[in-house]
């Protein structure tokens, strides 16, 4: 691990736990899901620069938006975001280039954790 990811929550993992978990994490786009933490990218440019321990994550869901061209009558596309809610109301979103990768990550959340997936 060249650069250790920064914790977004007040709760953190030890350096050894973090290194082992990130090494075994399954990557989906700029994000990854490990056994102890979810790793999110920064501004869609860098992969896994921040992490949240799964014990602090309250729920995750998919947010869809449309590009500016939709409103101008030009070519448009959908923008897919993974939104992670943590620490009593804080949110972090990570943009995915491919919606199917986001769907695979949400499916992994459903099967590997007890964290609620979807809006309540």
Say what each PLM segment does.
Residues 34-73:
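Phosphoinositide-binding peripheral membrane targeting modules
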Residues 27-29, 41-46, 87:
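Short strand-coil-strand connectors
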Residues 22-25, 43-45, 76-77:
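Short solvent-exposed loop/turn micro-motifs enriched in small/polar/acidic residues
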Residues 20, 39, 87-91:
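Generic, low-specificity signal for short hydrophobic/alpha-helical stretches with a mild N-terminal bias
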Residues 1-36:
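Anionic N-terminal interaction surfaces
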Residues 30-31, 50, 82:
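His/acidic/aromatic-lined binding-pocket segments of jelly-roll/cupin-type domains
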Residues 2-3, 59-120:
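Acidic, Ser/Thr- and proline-rich intrinsically disordered linker/docking segments
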């Amino acid at each position: 691990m060249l650069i250790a990811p920064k914790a977004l929550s007040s709760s953190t993992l030890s350096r050894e736990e973090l290194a082992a978990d990130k090494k075994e994490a399954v990557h989906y786009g700029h994000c990854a899901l490990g056994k102890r933490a979810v790793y999110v990218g920064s501004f869609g440019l860098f992969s896994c620069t921040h992490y949240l321990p799964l014990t602090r994550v309250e729920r995750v869901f998919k947010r869809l938006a449309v590009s500016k061209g939709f409103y101008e009558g030009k070519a448009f596309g959908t923008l897919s975001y993974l939104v992670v809610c943590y620490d009593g109301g804080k949110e972090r979103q990570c943009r995915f280039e491919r919606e199917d990768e986001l769907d695979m990550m949400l499916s992994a959340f459903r099967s590997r954790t007890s964290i609620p997936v979807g809006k309540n």
